[in-house]
């Protein structure tokens, strides 16, 4: 929609454009306007509140051209979804078009908390789907929603069952496990102590590394996680 495109161009910061381009190097720099996240978020909130019908029309017009249009779309899902099922429909339409980690990870859907059981079932669908960032989104949502009171040990095996080569999927898996080691050590540490190791070597070692980088664990835990690292093994 031309009005939205022009609005985003008016909000752009040329200095920020170069910085943002470095964060998502797989995106053509000419398709990044340089709108800062807080500015885009404020615009999305105003747009969703004052023009919800136009916002939903915009969300139906896929694919978008600019990186910021995709980010706006992601923000609008969280703002406009009335139920988990409403969000699922929006996400199933949008996620196949997501082409970078930043757009994927900015999507926050508060209504998921209304029905975690149904959301978990949907996450299980996403992580076995084909689109790269649909899988990543599923892992990120499992990390966001299911590592506290809703955690179940079987979730560790769920993420382990993902057998993909894409870097940004496996980074999300490592991110998930690093938080599991921090938040659910009684279950996650024995998971990492298994022989043979339950993950591919890269994800296993990256998970331990990211956990060691946290300030939330003790020096003793960091040393132990270092001792678990696989020095050399075939993936």
Predicted regions span which residues?
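Alpha-helical scaffold domains
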Residues: 1-235
């Amino acid at each position: 929609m031309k009005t939205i495109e022009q609005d985003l161009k008016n909000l752009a910061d040329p200095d920020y454009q170069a910085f943002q381009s470095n964060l998502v190097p797989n995106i053509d720099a000419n398709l990044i306007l340089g709108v800062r996240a807080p500015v885009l978020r404020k615009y999305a909130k105003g747009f969703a509140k004052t023009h919800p019908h136009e916002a939903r029309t915009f969300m139906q017009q896929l694919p978008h051209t600019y990186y910021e249009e995709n980010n706006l779309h992601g923000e609008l899902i969280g703002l406009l979804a009335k139920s988990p099922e409403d969000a699922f429909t929006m996400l199933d339409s949008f996620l196949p078009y997501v082409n970078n980690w930043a757009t994927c990870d900015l999507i926050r859907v508060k209504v998921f908390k209304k029905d975690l059981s149904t959301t978990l079932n949907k996450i299980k669908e996403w992580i076995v789907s084909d689109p790269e960032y649909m899988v990543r989104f599923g892992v990120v949502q499992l990390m966001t929603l299911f590592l506290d009171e809703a955690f179940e040990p079987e979730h560790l095996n769920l993420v382990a069952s993902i057998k993909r080569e894409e870097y940004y999927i496996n980074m999300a898996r490592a991110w998930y496990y690093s938080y599991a080691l921090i938040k659910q050590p009684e279950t996650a540490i024995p998971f990492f102590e298994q022989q043979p190791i339950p993950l591919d070597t890269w994800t296993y070692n990256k998970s331990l590394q990211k956990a060691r980088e946290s300030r939330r664990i003790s020096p003793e835990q960091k040393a132990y996680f270092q001792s678990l690292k696989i020095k050399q093994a075939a993936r």
